[in-house]
Amino acid sequence: MSALLEQKEQQERLREAAALGDIREVQKLVESGVDVNSQNEVNGWTCLHWACKRNHGQVVSYLLQSGADREILTTKGEMPVQLTSRREIRKIMGVEEADEEEEIPQLKKESELPFVPNYLANPAFPFIYTPAAEDSTQLQNGGPSPPPVSPPADSSPPLLPPTETPLLGAFPRDHSSLALVQNGDISAPSAILRTPESTKPGPVCQPPVSQNRSLFSVPSKPPVSLEPQNGTYAGPAPAFQPFFFTGAFPFNMQELVLKVRIQNPSLRENDFIEIELDRQELTYQELLRVSCCELGVNPDQVEKIRKLPNTLLRKDKDVARLQDFQELELVLMISDNNFLFRNAASTLTERPCYNRRASKLTY
């Protein structure tokens, strides 16, 4: 039973390698004895179907030389040649130009799906193997110098240059154009494939102002242009609220999460509670209102708001500079009716050296 499962796993690896264009992995699996005509149990696709679908001409040629059946059908009755979109691969499969115009367009309409599969909407990064990579390792190990690499016989330009590693940028929403770019039918625009920019030394902790302004600051004024004029910036710089990672990350970037409690040193357990403030309304009055509402305190009893350990909040700009999960204390006015401070007198009576008679003496 385990041998059968291992055999199916090897066949699935062969189909995956053919879909990615990994010619070395395909050669390794075929030489180890994996059946090139093995079909998937669900859709009936073989490794030749996948190689033709992804337009990997080198893999198609090798599979045909290894005995792959070009007439095998899927569960929908599709042959491998009907899945390709390149004339070069159709010639490799032995399809004439006259037959191509009659059969291929009609079969493509029949196999068109009403949705875009996930493996086509988010294709894997294409496997690119060049002899230069292997020769460079030989040169580093002291091996012989590599022979000059001749250009490929295929007239189609390579999708990616071998010397540069492009980055996958923002893909367009048209999945069909993305599939054509991956298959090499059209040239890739600069928005999809772009080379990495040259790295230059610069300040470490200076993120872009325009990006962080929309996330962490109060949009009180429209953005001011920061284009330099004669080497200097024109106009005042927009207000920027820095963001420091404190180990916990807020769930919603539109809210400012603060930790608030009532200042009472007589209590052994004086825990904080978390409150949320809208970043569009970071004012002192809003902070006072939300804090008193959550703690059940009358705003008239609040003497001041302290940012721990020893900073007093006085105005709206002080509140705008607050970061997520900062600790605040509400300092209340001491009065006889304030039940929170009744425990302060009881702590003296609990001491063993407390003299009740002496406490009532008047001088």
UniProtKB/Swiss-Prot annotation:
Modified residue Phosphoserine is at which positions?
Answer: 176
**Alphabetical UniProt keywords:** Acetylation, ANK repeat, Phosphoprotein, Repeat
State the organism of origin: Mus musculus (Mouse)
Q: Does the keyword Repeat apply?
A: yes
Spell out the protein name for this chain: Ankyrin repeat domain-containing protein 40
PROSITE patterns in alphabetical order? ANK_REP_REGION (PS50297), ANK_REPEAT (PS50088)
Q: Which residues carry this modification: N-acetylmethionine?
A: 1
Q: Gene3D superfamilies of this UniProt entry?
A: Ankyrin repeat-containing domain
Return the InterPro entries for the record. ANKRD40, Ankyrin_rpt, Ankyrin_rpt-contain_sf
Q: Give the encoding gene's name.
A: Ankrd40
Q: Where is the composition biased (Pro residues)?
A: 144-164
